Amino acid sequence: MKKPSKKSEIEFCTVCRFHHDQGSRHKYFPRHKSSLSSLLDRFRSKIADVRFFLKNPSVLRPQEQSQNRVWCVFCDEDIVELGSSFACSKAINHFASSDHLKNIKQFLSKNGPAMDCIDEFRISEADVAKWEKKCQSFGNEDASFEGSCGQLSGTSNDIHTKLAFETMDRIKKVPAHHINSYKSNDVMPLQYNTNEYQISLSEIPGVIHNGSYLNMDDSQFPLCDESGNGFGEHSIPCRSKDYSGNGNYCTQENYQVSQDKKQIDGSYNPPGVVGMTSISSSHSTDAGGNVHSGAPPPWLDANDGDFSSVQLNQSDVARFQAKVPGKNRKLNPNRVGAAWAERRKIEIEMEKSGHVTKSNIDPDWLPNFGRVWQSGTRKESRKEFEKEKRKLVKTESISTESEPVKIQPYISKRARRESGE
C-alpha cells in the first residue's frame, strides 16, 4: 500500500507574496515564474539607471538626496543617497559588494532561474574603479557646489537651473528706476473699503465713476510737474490714469488743492505734493446704486446703530423696541449686521403703525438673478418657465400659420425621370 506524501512546512514566498506548503517545487509553478520574471524586469530597469550614472557621474544636490533611492530585492534593503555627493554613489558601491553577490546567489537558488544571469544584477569592481577616477576629475567632493544658490563648479546637465540663474543675473543688472518708469495701466486692487473713501470728482470734465475707480481721459489733463511731485531724484511723469504713491490721482493745475485748505472733512494732502486731488473720507448718505457702482451694503452702512434716519423721538424708539419678540433678544448683539437688523425691525413696526420711513437703500443693490435665486421655490420657478415656454410655442405656431401653404400634386419618380430626360 502506497504511503501518502508528507506535506512540507508552510513558508512565505517573497516573489508571489503568499504562504504555501509546496516546498522547493513551488518555483516551477507558472504563477511563480510569471511573478519572478516581472520582478526581475523591474530590477533590471533600476540597475540600468544606476549604470547610466556609473558611466556619466554627476553631482547630487542636497535637496535631491532623499528622492534618489533604490530598493534591492535581493538584499531587502532600501538604499537612500543621504549624504552622497554624486548620484547613485551608495547604490553603485552596494551592487559591487560581496554581500550583494551572496544574496543574489541565495535568491536565484531558492526562486530560480539559472545562475548564468548573476552578472545582470551586479556591478563589477573594474567599473567601480573607473567611476571613482571620473569622480576624482571633478575635484574635491566638498567643493562641488559653488555659491549659496547651489550652482555647480563642474559640468552639469541641469539646463533648468542654468536658465534660472541667467535670468536672475539679467534682472539684477536692470536699474531700479528703469523698472519703476514702466508702470502698467492694469486694474489696481482696492486701496480702502468701499464705505470708507469715496472719490468726489463730479465737477471735473472727462472723469467717469466706475465702481471704486475713476476712468479719466489723457486729453483732459496734462502731465504733472516733475519738480514738485516729491518723488526724489528719479521722478516719474504721472498721467491722469496713474496712481501716485499715496493712492491719489494727478489732475489739472486748476483743480490743485493747497495745504491751507483744511475745511473739507477728511481731506488730506501730503507735504511737497503738487497737483493732487483731495479724496474725502466722508460718504454721501444720499448716494444710491448697487454693488457694481460702489454703493455700500445696508449691513455695512457707516450709520450702523444710528436711528437718525428714522424720524422718531426716544420714547417712540423705546416703544417700538419693546414690541420686538423675546426670542430675538437672545441673539448676539455684536453679530454682523446687528444694528441694521434692529433698525429694520423698528422700520417694520413703524410701517405697521402707519408711520412713513425714509430709506436711502437702493432695492437694486444686489443684482437680480431671477427666479429661484431671488425669491420663490423651485416648483414656482418651474411653473414660470413652463408658462413662458407655452407662450413661445404659441407665437411660433401663429407665425408659421400666417404663411400661405402651397399644395403641389404628387409626381412619381418615373414621371420625374421622364420629364428630366
From Swiss-Prot:
Residues 279-306, 376-421 are annotated as: Disordered. The keyword Repeat applies. Residues 377-389 have a biased composition (Basic and acidic residues). Key regulator for endosperm and embryo nuclear divisions. The keyword Iron-sulfur does not apply. Pfam families: CCDC84. Signal peptide: none annotated. The gene is TTL. At least nine differentially spliced transcript isoforms are produced. Full-length isoforms, but not the truncated ones lacking the C-terminal domain, are able to rescue disruption mutants. InterPro entries: CCDC84-like. GO terms for molecular function: zinc ion binding. It is found in: Nucleus. The lineage of its organism: Eukaryota, Viridiplantae, Streptophyta, Embryophyta, Tracheophyta. One of its GO terms (biological process) is embryo development ending in seed dormancy. The C-terminus is essential for the function of the protein and it contains two conserved motifs (289-300) and (365-389) of unknown function present in orthologous proteins from various eukaryotes. A motif (Nuclear localization signal 1) lies at residues 328-335. Keywords: Brassinosteroid signaling pathway, Metal-binding, Nucleus, Phosphoprotein, Repeat, Stress response, Zinc, Zinc-finger. Also present in cotyledons, hypocotyls, stems, veins of sepals and stigmas, and actively dividing tissues such as shoot apical meristem, root tips and emerging true leaves. Weak expression in petals and anthers, and not detected in mature leaves. In seeds, expressed in both the endosperm and embryo. GO terms for cellular component: nucleus. It comes from the Eukaryota. Its main location: nucleus. Disruption phenotype: Aborted seed development. Embryos arrested at the globular to heart stage transition and defective endosperm development with multi-nucleolated endosperm cells. This is TITAN-like protein. Coiled coil: none annotated. A motif (Nuclear localization signal 2) lies at residues 377-384. A zinc finger (C2H2-type) spans 11-32, 70-100. It comes from Arabidopsis thaliana.
